[in-house]
A protein has these predicted regions:
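Active-site loop/oxyanion-hole signature of alpha/beta-hydrolase fold enzymes
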Residues: 53, 61-63, 102-144, 310
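Flexible "cap/lid" loop of the alpha/beta hydrolase fold
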Residues: 154, 163-192
Length: 320
């Protein structure tokens, strides 16, 4: 990492010194959140907590008519099940909607085995589905959740009746431009050390701003939630453990083996998973349709939920 970048990070400590409690926070990092308080704030009904066979306690919501067609949502990095709120509000009228907090995210918290490879996430997804007794379903994944959904579909094609990927990671990145600074820092041991010690609500806000095209769409509620879950005990350390490893991109051969009908939704202005990554998926998947949304960044389901719903409904109608 260039020394100028590290210097800029160090200087940013001055702007958050008061918020983080000064020298103590620089040494130890931000205060940890209160689990009971966070559960009271974010875990009210229809939330439930289930225990998987691997011992993980998963925060989950299962809404809509139990007899309706099921649709399962898998959120992205540093998100949680609430990221789907705008889509779920309308989908519960026609679907059984399942969403949950991945390991090290939201109210699920760190995993008992402290492992954060893609195989662990896929295993959790599989166990959640089995726990709920679902045979086949539509699978929707965003960003990292899209990558997890792709990997799950590779191993369980008969269970996924349709696959919807929003700004999914896992494709090769060809742009000469770099990902946002926060992601670059996470790949560097010194960067992770610094982030832990200068992390603040303002930095949580900046992380959200990187995910959208129009930053005015970011609400205080969204910022508070990212901040709250980032200081959930153990979540940040688990994130650093995950970023210390490298998740390999998919190769064309394994992607071409997915015959499931797939919808790709991408923001034209996505700087985290650029449009070219969606085009790569579209070129490799044998039964894919790609929609590119202008003036939208990395979080189309948050930035333009109505447009996403229109695209999903229209596409699903072609499968009937």
């Amino acid at each position: 990492m260039p020394s100028s970048s590290l210097w800029n990070i160090l200087k940013s400590y001055q702007s958050v010194k008061k918020e983080m409690g000064g020298i103590r926070s620089l040494i130890f990092g931000p205060e940890k959140g209160d689990v009971g308080g966070l559960r009271a704030k974010y875990g009210q009904p229809p939330s439930q907590f289930i225990t998987l066979s691997n011992g993980a306690k998963i925060h989950l919501r299962d809404e809509g008519d139990p007899e309706a067609p099921p649709i399962v949502f898998v959120h992205g990095h540093s998100e949680d099940l609430h990221t789907w709120n705008q889509l779920v509000k309308q989908l519960v009228e026609s679907f059984r909607v399942i969403r949950f907090d991945l390991r090290r995210h939201g109210l699920t918290g760190p995993a008992p085995d402290n492992e954060y490879r893609i195989e662990n996430y896929v295993s959790d997804l599989s166990m959640v589905i089995d726990h709920l007794g679902i045979d086949s379903f539509a699978l929707v994944g965003h960003s990292m959740g899209g990558r997890i959904s792709v990997r799950y579909t590779m191993g369980n094609p008969e269970r996924v009746n349709s696959l919807i990927l929003l700004s999914a990671s896992g494709a090769p990145r060809k742009e000469e431009s770099s990902p946002p600074m926060a992601l670059r820092l996470m790949k560097n041991p010194l960067g992770r050390f610094l982030v832990k010690r200068i992390w603040s609500r303002n930095m949580a806000k900046n992380t959200l701003v990187d995910m959208v095209f129009d930053e005015s769409s970011i609400t205080d509620e969204e910022i508070d939630r990212m901040w709250d879950f980032s200081i959930y005990p153990g979540n940040m350390d688990a994130m650093f453990r995950e970023f210390a490893d490298t998740w390999e991109d998919f190769n064309p051969k394994e992607i071409r083996g997915i015959a499931n009908n797939t919808l790709l939704i991408w923001g034209k202005e996505d700087s985290i998973c650029p449009e070219s990554m969606g085009s790569w998926y579209d070129s490799q998947l044998p039964n894919s349709t790609m929609v590119v949304l202008p003036n939208i960044g990395h979080n189309p389901h948050f930035e333009c939920p109505d447009k996403c719903l229109d695209e999903i409904s229209s596409w699903m109608g072609t499968l009937s």
